[in-house]
A protein has these predicted regions:
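Short, surface-exposed charged micro-motifs
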Residues: 38, 66-68, 132
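Sec-dependent bacterial lipoprotein signal peptides
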Residues: 1-20
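Mature extracytoplasmic domains of secretory-pathway proteins
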Residues: 69-115
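Structural motif
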Residues: 45, 73-77, 140
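Helix-rich interaction surfaces within compact, conserved domain-sized segments
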Residues: 101-161
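N-terminal post-signal-peptidase region of extra-cytosolic proteins
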Residues: 51-64
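Bacterial Sec signal peptide processing site at the extreme N-terminus
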Residues: 17-36
Length: 161
């Protein structure tokens, strides 16, 4: 009976040590991810893969195709779906939120510890857009898009490297 109790205590102690090691590995992975996010934002070289859209009118939608928003140095590559009211557009609806343009304004601030707020202004042949992007240390992101001729729309996704 004594050997049985000793073996139980040893197994419980081993399990406890293994659990602590897993937590430490998880914390290290989170710290590495946060450092990678910070570096990508500092370099102005990141891509957000979008998986949900939240139109102003109507319900949210899960996106199954590959939609993304990418910032590379002084350029914005917007490949996002749009659903909502649009006013005074060219025949056929125009390009929507699918364009590659130079960034006219870029402001980045670190918010409460684990959040970055980025505001990007861009103009194409149809409209002027303001992209407000929130990126968290774990890579989760939200994008709000405002323009003069279209209803606002929001997206959520994840930073990819």
């Amino acid at each position: 009976m004594k050997k049985f109790l000793v073996s139980i205590v040893c197994m419980a102690g081993g399990a406890l040590l293994a659990a602590c090691g897993t937590t430490l590995g998880s914390a290290e992975a989170s710290a590495e991810r946060a450092a990678a996010v910070k570096q990508a934002l500092a370099d102005r070289n990141f891509k957000i893969e979008v998986n949900f859209m939240y139109p102003m009118r109507g319900s949210s939608r899960n996106l199954t195709s590959e939609y993304s928003l990418e910032v590379r140095n002084d350029s914005l590559f917007s490949h996002l779906p749009y659903m909502g009211e649009a006013r005074n557009l060219p025949y056929g609806g125009g390009v929507g939120l699918n364009f590659d343009e130079h960034i006219s304004s870029y402001v980045q601030q670190q918010q409460k510890g684990d959040e970055y707020l980025i505001e990007i202004g861009v103009k194409n042949t149809e409209d002027v857009y303001v992209y407000t992007i929130r990126v968290f240390d774990n890579g989760r992101s939200s994008i709000d898009v405002r323009s003069r001729l279209r209803d606002p729309i929001s997206y959520s996704g994840e930073l990819s490297f």
